[in-house]
Amino acid sequence: MSDRVGRPRVIRAPRFFCSLRPPALYPERVSLPGPDPFITATRNTDTMPEQSASVSPALSQPPAQAQVTGRFLRMLSIILELLAAVREADERAEFGGLTARARVLEAETNALEREIEDACLVAFAAGLSERELAFYLMVFRSLANLERVGDYAFSVARDLETYAPRARSSTLQDLLPLIRLLSEMVERLAYAFAERDLTAARDVMRLDFEQVDALYEQMQRASLTRLIERPEDNEVALTAGRMARNLERLGDHLVNVAERLETLMLHDQRAGLL
């Protein structure tokens, strides 16, 4: 992982993705003229801080671009749902059905990826302004990252359900801090994307650089220690190491998206558009 420069202090984003798909926030996808209903829902005044009179970037977009924004945010919310399902199963020590739940969420992520990809290709063919092109390129190039994030989260869910009955509780508990941190990174990334918040995008990079790597190394050391102390449990220890590695890579892909978003916002700042 590349070295990163110091980041600004943390400004916590509103946790408008914390609840798992409440109907008011996550309506079923429908084809509507105008902004995607998901974006309108995220602007609920009960969950967002007071804003100035300026219009949110997500709400001021052309209809086609707003639809892409809504679907991209939905991909992030699915990732958060998946991480929450893993975290709750680990906290409660109830792992039955976790893989099936993760498979459903991953399938929805894959479907959204195809929808967004098609929308981007249509936009590219139609001709775009420089700013619109920068937005669609950022989204298009980030789709592979979010798809990989979903893959890694699914792999962790599957391994957790498979090996949890044979693993010690301490092994499973080691995953929780990293999962919580990654969930926070997803929330910050979603807020940065919806609100064009540069600080929130940089928070994603800072959290990965300062905390994810340290937690990953800690988990790897713990896995190696257990492997030495209990060689008969080598398969479980190696699986714990693999889950830690997958979570660390998941964070790397979130950082890749945040870096592209930072570049997009800096470009808009220089052009006086933010």
From Swiss-Prot:
GO biological process assignments: intracellular phosphate ion homeostasis; negative regulation of phosphate metabolic process
InterPro entries according to UniProt: P_transport_PhoU, PhoU-like_sf, PhoU_dom
Pfam families: PhoU
The family this protein is said to belong to: Belongs to the PhoU family.
PANTHER family recorded: PHOSPHATE-SPECIFIC TRANSPORT SYSTEM ACCESSORY PROTEIN PHOU
Name recorded for this polypeptide: Uncharacterized protein DR_2053
UniProt organism field: Deinococcus radiodurans (strain ATCC 13939 / DSM 20539 / JCM 16871 / CCUG 27074 / LMG 4051 / NBRC 15346 / NCIMB 9279 / VKM B-1422 / R1)
Taxonomic lineage: Bacteria, Thermotogati, Deinococcota, Deinococci, Deinococcales
